[in-house]
Design a protein with these regions (language model features):
Chain A
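ABC-family P-loop ATPase nucleotide-binding domain
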Residues: 1-28, 239-244
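H-loop (His-switch) and adjacent beta-strand-loop-beta switch element
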Residues: 229-241
Length: 244, 419
């Protein structure tokens, strides 16, 4: 990762309100005694309702950026503002509660609990938030219906295909009605048909509910479906393009 | 779905490991419970043997100094007829006291006319002797038939009838219904002899005393010692053994206020054998308990440690979607709690089953210093079973805390990236 790479930050102009602001955000990891700068002073805004893809080659810092946006990692330098509030001021418990309420996660490896059924997996974030059993069940069932898995609510993940598992993961991310959904390589473990289906589904949720989606991908075909794509290279934003 | 459900499902993830840990807990629990049950049976048996079998009663009341200086100068410390009557009057309204029995201990020589040997005797009324021996055996012990010879009996209709220990009868080639002569020193130091009839023989249960012990009617003892109406102590029987200490303190205060200078000993204080056995078994129990708890601690720590490593990504996911650090610790604590509870539950069932097998198989053994075989019986010692469960739960939680605390402190991105 080159420290001399030019840093490009292209703020987008959109009428929607700004959901997330990254201000000179940097992230340094230590590999033994050696410091590795994964991100360099990123300045970047995400607006409510956007369907945004972060793309770039391996090692460009996509996952690091997603971790920071998802508030599951803290920047070494700079600040992240969510809805105008500085997240660096929050304690671990406050940040965790904030994530549980506002951010949904879709992981590359689905990260479903193997001992729970699809329904129970989707109920899990509601349970963590203290939503009662009956209400959680109703909402989780509805979320699974929305992703077309009404017939599979009692199936455990090992009985589902990759695409179905990722749909369960989408339902789990959306069931808490988050304002932002982070999806790190959500299609990496899927074939092209399922990949497109997942992206279409996320896009539909974005349009229907106004939920902001930020996802990373290697697959250039999927970029055609987004309304903003951010190219990351060597820890810097190389290009930030909006699709008309 | 709640934390309990989630924890239960977590246990099924690696069911083989969960079962192995559960069995370690169960076998440990059963081992402790069975040993506790065995020692409980020994303690209660020894307590009944001391109180009812050795006729110690619950409390023994004597003049202060009787147990020390009185050994050399008994005459000075004997209770007089008047003192016995006054003490009995003072205690007659105590509802917890069911029997007050004057006693007179003495020793001397017993002879069959051809050979003589020493004896130790207790003078006691035949009625009091019967009362003291009530509740000596449990139904199970009575059914076993192994304790039949422990009963001591004096015939109230025969003033010169005595009961001799089985070893003494054997030693002097006596027989029930036969004659013997008791030779003693009176209180004033004169020699005195009396013909007696052997009305019965008994087993003291102790090899050390089974060839020298005798029971004689109190009147006969008083006559032999030329101590008309006198007693060296009063044996009290209470309604409730658990009240022994409290009643002792109350009686001591009451009798002291009435002008008596007396000492009152509990049966535990008088039965050094009970105290020694109790102390020894408590030590062994503590030793076994410590070993089993250490095994449980290591099993649970190993199990939770492996589980935490195995489920690192799951923990990362849960943390990402909103589970607080305390929630992670709570989840693993609940899993451990369930595992330990289930282990204790299985251990309890094992205890019941093995106990049933042991008690039903009529195993007998001769205890150290015992004069006869006794059945191996195991009780259900519920207080110590409960204590074992509570301690096992505490140890389980302790074992689970460190690995679950570490996993909760782990960075989410490290946990999510765990392979």
């Amino acid at each position: 990762m080159s420290l001399s790479h030019p840093r490009v930050s292209v703020p987008t102009q959109r009428p929607a309100s700004t959901l997330l602001q990254l201000r000179e955000v940097g992230r340094r990891f230590m590999l033994g005694e050696t410091p590795i700068d994964a991100l360099h002073a990123i300045r970047f805004d995400i607006h409510a309702g956007e369907f945004l893809a972060v793309w770039g080659p391996s090692g460009s810092g996509k996952s690091t950026l997603m971790n920071l946006i998802g508030l599951i990692d803290a920047p070494t330098t700079g600040e992240i503002y969510f809805d105008g509030h500085c997240t660096g001021d929050l304690s671990d418990d406050e940040l965790t509660a904030f994530r549980g309420k506002n951010i949904g996660f879709i992981f590359q490896g689905f990260n479903l609990m193997p001992v729970l059924s699809a329904l129970e997996n989707v109920m899990l974030p509601l349970h963590i938030r203290g939503v009662g059993g009956r209400e959680a069940r109703t909402r989780a069932t509805a979320a699974l219906q929305d992703v077309g898995l009404a017939k599979f609510i009692h199936s455990r993940p090992d009985k589902l295909s990759g695409g179905q598992r990722q749909r369960v993961a989408i339902a789990r991310a959306l069931v808490v009605e988050p304002r932002l959904v982070i999806a790190d390589e959500p299609t990496a473990n899927l074939d092209s048909h399922n990949s497109l289906m997942i992206i279409d589904m996320m896009r539909e949720m974005n349009r229907a509910r106004g939920v902001t989606f930020v996802f990373t991908t290697h697959d250039p075909r999927l970029l055609a479906h987004v309304d903003r794509k951010v190219l990351l290279q060597d820890g810097c934003i190389e290009r930030d393009e909006s699709t008309p | 779905m709640n934390t309990l459900t989630l924890a239960l499902r977590g246990l099924t993830r690696n069911h083989r490991r969960s079962i192995v840990t559960l069995l370690a807990i169960a076998f440990g629990f059963a081992a402790i419970s069975l040993f506790a049950g065995y020692t409980h049976n020994i303690y209660s048996g020894l307590a009944r043997q001391s109180i009812h079998g050795e006729l110690l009663g619950h409390l023994t009341l004597s003049k202060r100094g009787m147990s020390t200086a009185g050994k050399l100068d008994p005459q000075r410390y004997l209770l007089t007829l008047d003192e016995v009557a006054r003490i009995e009057a003072a205690l007659q309204h105590e509802p917890q006291i069911t029997l007050i029995a004057p006693r007179l201990a003495f020793s001397g020589l017993v002879t069959n006319g051809r050979a003589s040997t020493i004896f130790i005797a207790e003078g006691i009324s035949p009625q009091a002797m019967d009362r003291l021996q009530e509740n000596m055996l449990t139904e199970q012990e009575a059914r076993s038939g192994m304790y039949d010879r422990l009963a001591k009996k004096l015939d109230p209709a025969r003033e010169s009838g005595v009961a001799l220990s089985a070893g003494l009868v054997e030693l002097l080639h006596l027989h029930v219904g036969g004659e013997a002569i008791l030779l003693v020193n009176t209180l004033s130091g004169q020699a005195n002899a009396m013909d007696v009839t052997v009305d019965g023989s008994f087993n003291t249960g102790n090899a050390g005393t089974n060839d020298k012990f005798a029971f004689v009617p109190l009147a006969l003892a008083q006559s032999l010692l030329d101590a008309e109406g006198r007693a060296d102590r009063l044996t009290l029987l209470l309604e409730d053994v658990t009240q022994t200490e409290a009643i002792r303190d109350r009686l001591l205060a009451k009798l002291s206020a009435a002008g008596f200078d007396l000492e009152i000993a509990t049966w535990q204080e008088l039965s050094s054998f009970y105290r020694q056995v109790h102390g020894m078994f408590n030590m062994i129990f503590g030793f076994i308990f410590s070993i089993v708890l250490a095994v449980v601690l290591m099993s649970v720590a190993n199990s939770v440690g492996m589980t935490v490593i195995e489920r690192t990504r799951e923990i990362g996911t849960l943390r990402a979607i909103g589970l607080k650090r305390s929630g992670v610790i709570r989840l693993f604590a609940t899993e451990t709690l369930l595992l330990t509870l289930l282990g204790c539950g299985v251990g309890f069932l094992l205890t019941v089953g093995v106990r049933y097998g042991i008690n039903g198989s009529h195993i007998a053994y001769t205890p150290p210093n015992g004069a006869n075989a006794v059945p191996l019986l195991v009780d259900m010692d519920y207080p110590r079973i409960l204590l074992t469960m509570v301690l096992m739960l505490a140890v389980g939680m302790l074992a689970a805390f460190l690995p679950s605390f570490r996993s909760a402190r782990q960075h989410i991105i490290d946990a999510l990236g765990h392979v």
